[in-house]
Amino acid sequence: IAQYDAPKLLLRLDDNGMNHSVTMAIKQVAATGMPFSSSVMFACPWYQEAVAVLKQYPQVSVGVHLTLNSEWKYYRWGPVLGQSAVPSLVDSNGHFQASTAAFLKSAYKLDEVEKELSAQVERAMHSGLPIDYVDYHMGTATSTPELRAIVEKIARKYRLGISRYFGENYQTMFAVSVETKKDEFLKRAAGFSKDKVNLMVMHVAEATPEMNALVDMNNTDQHSDTKPLVAMHRSAELNTLLSPEFQKLVKSGAVKLVTYRDLVKEQGLDKMKAGN
């Protein structure tokens, strides 16, 4: 199949810099040479490793994963600005709320949201990486019209794209079972739209002791007392992207990989509009 006929696939690998296991998985994908987009959590303790890795792989388009939540049971983080600067955004321990629902129920102040999310973008800008876009961890930063307006304002101020504002056809593998992830991904790839950019949001990680220890406080599908489901899900997504079957699709030109850097270049920032 000629490349110009091929459906466009935008891989967005989220949670970069959340911990070592996620960043090392994203490094494995980057080492294939594939162009993709990766969203970094600049509020997390490991973000500097993500920055160092991404500097080695300029084909990766970098975004800021705007973060207002901290969802793991024993591994928590808080605002870049510190709890005293944005007290309405944190719980009694100074961490972000665990879920979107808990955040929305809390007495968060919009001006503090704007200050903190701006600080996350500033930290990204100061990292030395070229930053192309923003998106939103767990959807919290766009979960009300007022919050969404803040994200749009920040993107305008820093001249950044916003994920899902370029008419993308959005999909995720998050809820697909561990056993069927690869087959389901390949099945979807065979049916990708040629009219729109197919955005596939992925969460990859290496199945390490660090990853095995993570318990998602919000997600019963990925929590079990007997199995490290988070690690199993995320390593299955990693293995899907590294699989010979997917690599063959890319190399044969059956799908054309694009990034947010490409979309910003082709469509510009002024036509951006909130999508599905």
Where are the regions that the model predicts?
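C-terminal domain-boundary segment and adjacent tail
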Residues: 162-165, 221-276
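Histidine/acidic-residue-rich catalytic or RNA/ligand-binding cores of hydrolases
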Residues: 22-23, 73-76, 147-148, 173-183, ...
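Conserved, mostly hydrophobic/aromatic
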Residues: 15, 62, 134, 200, ...
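Acidic (Asp/Glu)-rich catalytic clusters
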Residues: 26-32, 48-61, 78-91, 125-126, ...
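Catalytic domains of cell-wall/extracellular-matrix polysaccharide-remodeling enzymes
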Residues: 107-194
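Active-site gating loops and adjacent loop-to-helix segments of metal-dependent hydrolytic enzymes
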Residues: 77-103, 216-229
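Active-site beta-loop-alpha junctions enriched in small/polar residues
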Residues: 16, 43, 65-71, 139, ...
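Active-site beta->alpha N-cap acidic-glycine motif
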Residues: 3-73
